[in-house]
């Protein structure tokens, strides 16, 4: 019967190892899909086995796109060999050839299967119509006995509990029906003729065993090792039977005994199926209700005859050669047994072997209990592979071992039939097979994966780097463990930075409002100071220019503070984005510059973002105080100066004996602190001093006329001179002193 795309897709998923299947699920959840296709929920994909995963792919994406998506994910996860095999198997040319060759056989087999189902299991058609998922998988994956039937099966199983226990304790107990955990399908004679030249594919375990045999023989001709690859649909524990060439006759005889038991099991299954005992056993609840076991009479007879004829021919030829006087070669016997097993089992034949395969298959109770026990256990353990849990769709059946302990040995029935030497060799091979090839390799040591992380150097290292002198005494941990710790640190820093960002956003509006108030106050003070200065007969023009310059620099300082604030906020956003991107990076990229990134995050504080330079507030406060003081003093000075300097002809006589006091005038002049440098704050005292002539301690009497001359002409002349001198009094002569930083204006 020709395989369909669904079969090839399921076989490909079953070929994946556990960690490869998890990687496939993760890539399936993260890869981009075409338009019109929805993503499968993660909760369904997470715990799905190959069968359920195939059903989900077909349900959500259809047969064609499911195959294309599987090919895309396999290539993305470096499973190129499986991708090529699936591509060749599902190509249009291959499918056309298979459909042309096995179309008639498949149709006849399906009709016969339907006839057996209709006669043996009444009501199964209705169950298949109610189940929407049964149409997705091939007919060999159809499920029977759902719903209330499971409860009745469980009850009947509980009732038969003591009987099953008694059958397990009896050494010669035999099973009631040959129920296995796999579905048995054979090829028709047409398939045999069309595919006579096809050779069964060797599994990965066989290739590794052949390679190890060739290496141990030191360049001699490697013997071809063959195995029975038992495909599994429902349970991940699938067994393989590697047959190696032995040099001892007892072990070869054990292989023949095991082979004969398997042949008896196949014939017993055929007879039980023809007599209708399979359906009866399923109804009693001993077998597995998930899978129907149907065997066509013609195909079963062909398979049995094929096995018997092949065994007779090869065994007769082998024993005849040894009986003619030639030496008895164990290699020939091993090759004969291997050929018998592999020739009798094609890739389409699925044998169901339980945990107690070595028991006599003629015992119905024993086989039934083994099948039920195998069904109840969801996890299987292989002593040769040393793997437990949900294995991929291929494992191994141990037939022989290079040590003295063999699986057929009755002394080793209560323990694992494998020696410590085989365990160590197989453990090394499994580690090599499961080593991740996508991890970055060490730049110093080729073909060494960086699986460790040095805490002192903050960098990933390999095992050889760990043993080097450079990392002696350093704290070294697995990179996964270190990545978890650093991810936790990144998460904490992200939470802190996000809280800081929220705090900054909350205080952003008040800060802007304060800046606007500062600018308004500055502009108001500028206007209030500019008006009195203009009214004081323009003798404060230079003072006004200096003051305006100082205010402009103050405005620029406030603007720089605002720019600094926005710059810090942008840096905070950039740092948050870098940390978010760093958190999603793979482990080996995450650990490259983790120290510098965390240091930047730890040094970022909210005070840097919201902190206003302390000099700005002090300058504004000082400006406010000094401006008010200058306004009052200038007003007083203007009024007093106007009253004191208003010279007229009527006031000359009355003010004849009164001279203006320099100390009094000096007290009326304000002291103003100015900022002349934009980068540094410099306080200057503006002092109006009288210009002293050489040798005099008091200013000359410029403003008062002589009392000796009191004519109107002279009075007019003195009045003009006084006005001229008063104008010269209003002229500024600024001088800057670097020692005391005082600005003095003299006249």
Swiss-Prot record:
Degraded along with the delivery of its substrates to autolysosomal compartments (at protein level). Expressed in spleen and, to a lesser degree in the lung. Not expressed in thymus, testis, ovary, heart, brain, liver, kidney and muscle. CDD domains: Bbox2_TRIM20 (cd19771). The lineage of its organism: Eukaryota, Metazoa, Chordata, Craniata, Vertebrata. The keyword Coiled coil applies. It is found in: Cytoplasm, Cytoskeleton; Cell projection, Ruffle; Cell projection, Lamellipodium; Cytoplasm. Keywords: Actin-binding, Cell projection, Coiled coil, Cytoplasm, Cytoplasmic vesicle, Cytoskeleton, Immunity, Inflammatory response, Innate immunity, Metal-binding, Microtubule, Nucleus, Zinc, Zinc-finger. A zinc finger (B box-type) spans 442-479. Involved in the regulation of innate immunity and the inflammatory response in response to IFNG/IFN-gamma. Organizes autophagic machinery by serving as a platform for the assembly of ULK1, Beclin 1/BECN1, ATG16L1, and ATG8 family members and recognizes specific autophagy targets, thus coordinating target recognition with assembly of the autophagic apparatus and initiation of autophagy. Acts as an autophagy receptor for the degradation of several inflammasome components, including CASP1, NLRP1 and NLRP3, hence preventing excessive IL1B- and IL18-mediated inflammation. Pfam families: PYRIN, zf-B_box. Zn(2+) binds at residues 442, 445, 465, 471. GO terms for biological process: inflammatory response; innate immune response; negative regulation of cytokine production involved in inflammatory response; negative regulation of inflammatory response; negative regulation of interleukin-1 beta production; negative regulation of interleukin-12 production; negative regulation of macrophage inflammatory protein 1 alpha production; negative regulation of NLRP3 inflammasome complex assembly. PANTHER family: E3 UBIQUITIN-PROTEIN LIGASE TRIM. Residues 89-181, 698-720 are annotated as: Disordered. Residues 1-92 form the Pyrin domain. Residues 479-508 form a coiled coil. This is Pyrin. Residues 487-645 are annotated as: Required for homotrimerization and induction of pyroptosomes. Its main location: cytoplasm. Homotrimer. Interacts (via the B box-type zinc finger) with PSTPIP1. Interacts (via the B30.2/SPRY domain) with several components of the inflammasome complex, including CASP1 p20 and p10 subunits, CASP5, PYCARD, NLRP1, NLRP2 and NLRP3, as well as with unprocessed IL1B; this interaction may lead to autophagic degradation of these proteins. Component of the AIM2 PANoptosome complex, a multiprotein complex that drives inflammatory cell death (PANoptosis). Interacts with NFKBIA and RELA. Interacts weakly with VASP and ACTR3. One of its GO terms (cellular component) is ruffle. One of its GO terms (molecular function) is identical protein binding. Residues 122-135 have a biased composition (Acidic residues). InterPro entries: DAPIN, DEATH-like_dom_sf, TRIM/RBCC, Znf_B-box. The B box-type zinc finger interacts, possibly intramolecularly, with the pyrin domain; this may be an autoinhibitory mechanism released by PSTPIP1 binding.
């Amino acid at each position: 019967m020709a395989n369909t795309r669904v079969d090839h897709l399921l076989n490909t998923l079953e070929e994946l190892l556990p960690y490869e299947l998890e990687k496939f699920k993760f890539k399936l959840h993260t890869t981009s899909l075409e338009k019109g296709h929805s993503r499968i929920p993660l909760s369904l994909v997470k715990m799905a086995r190959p069968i359920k995963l195939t059903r989900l792919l077909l349900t959500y994406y259809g047969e064609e796109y499911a195959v294309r998506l599987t090919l895309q994910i396999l290539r993305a996860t470096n499973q190129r060999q499986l991708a090529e095999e699936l591509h060749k198997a599902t190509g249009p040319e291959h499918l056309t050839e298979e459909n042309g060759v096995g179309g008639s056989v498949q149709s006849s087999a399906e009709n016969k299967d339907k006839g057996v189902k209709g006669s043996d299991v009444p009501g199964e058609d209705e169950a298949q119509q109610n189940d929407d998922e049964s149409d997705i998988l091939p007919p060999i994956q159809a499920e029977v006995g759902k719903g209330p039937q499971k409860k009745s099966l469980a009850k009947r199983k509980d009732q038969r509990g003591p009987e099953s226990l008694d059958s397990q304790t009896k050494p010669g107990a035999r099973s009631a029906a040959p129920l296995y955990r796999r579905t048995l399908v054979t090829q028709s004679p047409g398939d045999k003729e069309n595919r006579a030249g096809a050779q069964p594919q060797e599994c990965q375990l066989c290739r590794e065993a052949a390679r190890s045999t060739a290496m141990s023989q030191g360049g001699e001709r490697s013997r071809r090792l063959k195995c029975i690859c038992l495909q599994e649909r429902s349970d991940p524990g699938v067994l393989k039977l590697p047959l190696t060439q032995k040099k001892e006759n007892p072990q070869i005889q054990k292989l023949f005994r095991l082979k004969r038991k398997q042949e008896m099991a196949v014939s017993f299954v055929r007879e039980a199926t023809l007599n209708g005992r399979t359906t009866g056993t399923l109804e009693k609840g001993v077998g597995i209700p998930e899978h129907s076991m149907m065997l066509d009479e013609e195909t079963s007879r062909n398979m049995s005859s094929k096995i018997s004829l092949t065994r007779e021919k090869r065994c007769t030829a082998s024993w005849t050669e040894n009986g003619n006087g030639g030496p008895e070669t164990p290699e020939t016997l091993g090759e004969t047994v291997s050929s018998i097993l592999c020739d009798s089992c094609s890739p389409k034949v699925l044998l169901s072997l339980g945990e107690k395969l070595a028991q006599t298959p003629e015992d119905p109770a024993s086989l039934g209990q083994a099948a039920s026990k195998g069904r109840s256990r969801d996890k299987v353990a292989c002593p040769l592979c040393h793997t437990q849990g949900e294995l991929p769709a291929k494992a191994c059946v141990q037939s022989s071992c290079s040590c003295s302990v063999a699986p057929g040995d009755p002394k080793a029935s209560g323990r694992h039939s494998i020696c410590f030497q085989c365990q160590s060799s197989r453990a090394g091979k499994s580690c090599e097979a499961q080593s991740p090839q996508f991890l970055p390799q060490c730049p110093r040591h080729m073909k060494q994966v960086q699986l460790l992380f040095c805490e002192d150097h903050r960098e990933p290292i390999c095992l050889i780097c760990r043993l080097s002198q450079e990392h002696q005494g350093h704290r070294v941990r697995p990179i996964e463990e270190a990545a978890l710790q650093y991810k936790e640190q990144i998460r904490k820093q992200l939470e802190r930075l996000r809280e800081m960002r929220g705090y900054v956003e909350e205080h952003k509006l008040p800060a802007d409002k304060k800046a606007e108030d500062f600018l308004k106050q500055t502009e108001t003070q500028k206007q209030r100071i500019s008006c009195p200065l203009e009214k004081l007969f323009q003798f404060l023009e230079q003072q006004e220019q200096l003051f305006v310059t100082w205010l402009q620099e103050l405005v620029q300082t406030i603007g720089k503070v605002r720019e600094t604030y926005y710059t810090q906020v942008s840096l905070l956003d950039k740092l948050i984005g870098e940390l978010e991107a760093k958190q999603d990076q793979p482990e080996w990229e995450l650990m490259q510059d983790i120290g510098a990134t965390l240091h930047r995050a730890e040094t970022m504080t909210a005070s840097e973002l919201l902190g206003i330079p302390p000099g700005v507030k002090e300058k504004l406060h000082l400006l406010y105080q000094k401006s008010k003081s200058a306004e009052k003093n200038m007003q007083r000075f203007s009024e007093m100066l106007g009253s004191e300097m208003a010279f007229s002809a009527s006031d000359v006589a009355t003010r004849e004996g009164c001279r203006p006091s320099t100390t009094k005038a000096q007290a009326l002049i304000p002291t103003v602190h100015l900022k002349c440098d934009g980068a540094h704050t410099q306080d200057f005292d503006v002092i109006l001093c009288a210009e002293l002539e050489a040798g005099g301690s008091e200013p000359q009497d410029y403003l008062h006329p002589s009392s000796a001359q009191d004519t109107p002409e002279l009075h007019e002349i003195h009045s003009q001179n006084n006005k001229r001198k008063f104008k010269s009094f209003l002229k500024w002569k600024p001088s800057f002193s670097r020692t005391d930083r005082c600005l003095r204006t003299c006249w």
